[in-house]
Amino acid sequence: MTPADLAELLKATAAAVLAEHGLDSAALPAIVTVERPRNPEHGDYATNLALQLGKKVGANPRELAGWLAAALVAKDGIAAADVAGPGFVNLRIEASAQNVIVGDVIAAGATYGASGELDGRRVNLEFVSANPTGPIHIGGTRWAAVGDALGRLLSTQGAEVVREYYFNDHGAQIDRFTNSLIAAAKGEPAPEDGYAGTYIADIAAQVLAKEPGALELPDAEMRETFRAVGVNLMFDHIKESLHEFGTDFDVYTHEDSMHTSGRVDQAIAKLRETGSIYEKDGAVWLRTTDFGDDKDRVVIKSDGQPAYIAGDLAYFLDKRKRGFDLCIYMLGADHHGYIARLKAAAAALGDDPDTVEVLIGQMVNLVRDGQPVRMSKRAGTVITLDDLVDAIGVDAARYALIRSSVDTPIDIDLALWSSASNENPVYYVQYAHARLSALARNAAELGVAADTAHLDLLTHDKEGTLIRNIGEFPRVLKTAASLREPHRVSRYLEDLAGDYHRFYDSCRVLPQGDETPGDLHAARLALCAATRQVIANGLGILGVSAPERM
């Protein structure tokens, strides 16, 4: 019996109890949940449903809890149901009902935890989208890890996810990048408002290798050559770094194409039709205040040049024409103002603003020996994705960046995350998987096979705790996906790894010496196989490897 199964039983039982006592069963919440008590002595699961219902149906919550407990204890699979406090019900599950979870996990394999919650939904997930003016910095690296994990997570719930990178190759930053490349190619210092770092000199040299006569071209041709070739080279490097980090995209959209293809003009024309556009002081404005923004936004500046939001409008319209039900934008800490702006843009274009979700990520800091690490050899001023991977590896980097809620700034201690110790969270989880893999190999050598035929023998409290936790995995994924919080998966895995290590220390899995393999060994091996599967599934969602040996 999984937590989801128990919740369904609880809801059905509560409906019957309410009807039996002449109370309104319509008061039942759409979703009924059970929780694991912090203190195991209070039971396997607990519910506050009677407290939720008491006032709504005009019943004393504790009395209602008593009726509910009496009805539940009569159900198959419920060993005990006790009333606690003002109206809580603590539940204990019969081992025979609980232990079937082990067989369910083994049968489902790599699909365990998946659901059809988002079947039929087409989701556009745009993340990283860094300017092609330098390597991916540490903030963008956080999005590369979290965005990829979120895409995997949404896919487990049935969504069709398209990962998209919006290539910001339009605007003043590209001009500054071009000027920096030309200066480096000429052996001159970087412009005051330009970009520094050895990567600029490297790309300038590559431009000259591809176009040896670039510096002799007329000025306009020279600039266009360095711009076009340099941007492509930089973006190739960005894509290579992301690929090696385990993050790939389905679609790359060029911002410049929004302007050159006429899609910006089309979006503005559509807004004129709806009356959402007006002119003032020689500029073209969008009435975003009509849709919740704090001020109207300039779309076309007084000099005739499009403002940044013009591209955003065209881009959103382009996404909706491609048939996405939901567009998720993952932006940096300095983009809070974009939330209302993007939602207002969607509404102005005649769409539901709830089809737009904006996630804002906070800063990432690196620490070594208690001191902040601020300088990159490659980029000159910022820490890059490649710097982080060089320091602690892909697995540790991804895990460290995913492990905390994106709205929380994080410090990454390079010494901790590169250590082979239980204090290193990714090592702790991966070691559990490696330990389980070694156990499976040793069992094979002894001729002992996992078997679910005698799961009723799993009665040790550490076995029960481990089984209940692997039963939580589908609910963890469902919650993490609905809240867009993949960090919940990593925290769950750490908790599960802890339960496994404690089980292993308390329950001998394999026969020793001349001991004959028995049904309990086979049942415990099945529990280990299920635990190993859940850890592998969870690490896969995070894009982190599940090593067989460590």
Curated annotation (Swiss-Prot):
CDD domains reported in the protein's UniProt record: Anticodon_Ia_Arg, ArgRS_core
Gene3D superfamilies: Arginyl tRNA synthetase N-terminal domain (3.30.1360.70), HUPs (3.40.50.620), Isoleucyl-tRNA Synthetase, Domain 1 (1.10.730.10)
Keywords, comma-separated and alphabetical: Aminoacyl-tRNA synthetase, ATP-binding, Cytoplasm, Ligase, Nucleotide-binding, Protein biosynthesis
Catalytic activity entry: tRNA(Arg) + L-arginine + ATP = L-arginyl-tRNA(Arg) + AMP + diphosphate
Enzyme Commission no: 6.1.1.19
Keyword Repeat tagged: no
Motif ('HIGH' region): 130-140
Gene Ontology BP, a term: arginyl-tRNA aminoacylation
Record carries keyword Oxidoreductase: no
GO CC aspect terms: cytoplasm
Family: Belongs to the class-I aminoacyl-tRNA synthetase family.
UniProt-listed NCBIfam families: argS (TIGR00456)
Oligomer and partners: Monomer.
HAMAP family reported for this sequence: Arg_tRNA_synth
Protein name (record): Arginine--tRNA ligase
UniProt organism field: Mycolicibacterium vanbaalenii (strain DSM 7251 / JCM 13017 / BCRC 16820 / KCTC 9966 / NRRL B-24157 / PYR-1) (Mycobacterium vanbaalenii)
Gene: argS
